[in-house]
């Protein structure tokens, strides 16, 4: 779980968000910011100090690419962490996920409200309000 910063607060996708929010991230994949900004049609609109890029906007503001996992249920990271332990791996304890970063103290869900806002803002501002009634009129 990494802390994210909003860089484009005026974008309706972030309406209702706090200035800083948390989001689950996979520890097995990375997309470098340099690779994203090398494409003129893409813009980084949210990132964190530790995790890097979280959200990218493209194609005239109608497409969003999310590099974290706001869809994760509360126990997903816990399941993955304990699964890897049982396989004899030495996984990193997910940051900011357990109370006091201690798996024995229980979960601390910090991303649920942002995830709900993200999906409802996307549906409201970028699907319902921007999609023509006649789908043949989409540009």
Label each PLM-derived region with a short phrase.
Residues 70-139:
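Acyltransferase
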């Amino acid at each position: 779980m990494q802390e994210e910063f909003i860089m484009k607060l005026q974008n309706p996708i972030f309406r209702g968000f706090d200035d800083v929010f948390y989001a689950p991230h996979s520890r097995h994949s990375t997309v470098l910011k340099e690779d994203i900004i090398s494409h003129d049609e893409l813009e980084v609109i949210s990132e964190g100090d530790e995790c890097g890029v979280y959200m990218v906007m493209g194609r005239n503001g109608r497409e969003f690419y999310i590099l974290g996992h706001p869809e994760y249920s509360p126990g997903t990271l816990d399941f993955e962490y304990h699964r890897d332990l049982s396989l004899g791996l030495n996984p990193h304890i997910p940051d900011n996920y357990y109370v006091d970063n201690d798996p024995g103290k229980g979960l601390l869900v910090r991303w649920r409200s942002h995830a709900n806002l993200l999906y409802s803002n996307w549906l409201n501002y970028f699907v319902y309000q921007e999609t023509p009634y006649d789908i043949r009129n989409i540009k």
